[in-house]
Regions:
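Short, surface-exposed, charged amphipathic helix/loop patches that serve as local interaction elements
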Residues: 1-260
């Protein structure tokens, strides 16, 4: 009977860009890869397994993160990107056969790069980002305000659990940055507030397109710009056109899990 090897897996330290916490992650083993393969059936299941895979990879974590739920509540989506990068880097390192479509001639070609050569990070240095929120008035829907925040993994888990179907997934994810929408009457009186997720989605769908773009511009300026980027300069193999390519970390992570 197999009783286990005495193996010390490679480790990598990650400082999360938005909550500024230090974690040491270890590389995946084959069993964990197999679990991830089995999870890729529904978005909710894949998301849950990915979160647990990252959490289980921690060799060292902050004292304030005692449980899995505590980690979900104290980790932003942008922080998870950084932790996933650390897990990817220590497990696979190379980004192999990444398909790029040229913006000039529109032909596809494959490239291989080291993940570390594409990495850059901008940290949030203005205190506790998780409990911060701000109101912004919408430019077209006058007197309507959106309260914007940086969503956590817990927010995402709750939204996925309550979604109305796979077709709703994109809009559930899209509206995680909105804590509530409310309208203040011009004549005074109480505001009409929509803070339940389904009400937020219905209200969001009624907004003008310019209002939607305004919400995301404000989110990016206050929160979204803080995180990691995986960018590389690439030259088209067909026409020689050079352009900056942004790498899809989650998609590439699952692609590597499925490769031999």
């Amino acid at each position: 009977m197999f009783t286990g090897f005495n193996i010390k897996y490679p480790e990598y330290e990650v400082i999360t860009p938005q909550t500024n916490l230090s974690y040491h992650v270890r590389s995946l083993n084959v069993q964990e890869e197999e679990r991830l393969k089995a999870s890729f059936l529904t978005p909710t299941k894949a998301n849950d397994h990915l979160n647990k895979c990252i959490f289980d990879s921690f060799v060292v974590k902050p004292e304030s993160i005692a449980t899995y739920d505590a980690w979900l509540k104290k980790t932003t989506l942008k922080d998870r990107d950084a932790l996933l990068y650390g897990l990817y880097h220590i497990t696979y390192e190379d980004i192999r056969n990444y398909d790029v479509t040229c913006g000039q001639c529109e032909k596809s070609y494959a490239v291989t790069v080291k993940a570390s050569e594409t990495f850059s990070m901008k940290s949030y240095e203005n205190g506790d980002i998780i409990n911060k929120e701000f109101d912004t008035e919408l430019p077209i829907s006058k007197t309507v305000f959106a309260t914007i925040k940086q969503p956590t993994l817990w927010d995402e888990v709750m939204a996925l659990k309550n979604q109305r179907g796979t077709k709703e997934l994109d809009i559930f994810t899209e509206t995680l940055i909105i804590k509530k929408l409310f309208q203040t009457p011009e004549t005074g009186g109480d505001s009409v507030v929509y803070s339940e997720r389904e009400d937020i989605i219905d209200a969001y769908r009624s907004l003008a397109s310019k209002d939607k773009r305004h919400i995301y511009k404000e989110y990016r300026e206050k929160f979204g710009q803080y995180g990691i980027n995986l960018n590389m300069l690439s030259n088209c193999h067909h026409c020689g056109h050079e352009e900056l390519i942004s790498i899809d970390l989650v998609g590439n992570f699952f692609r590597m899990v499925y490769s031999i």
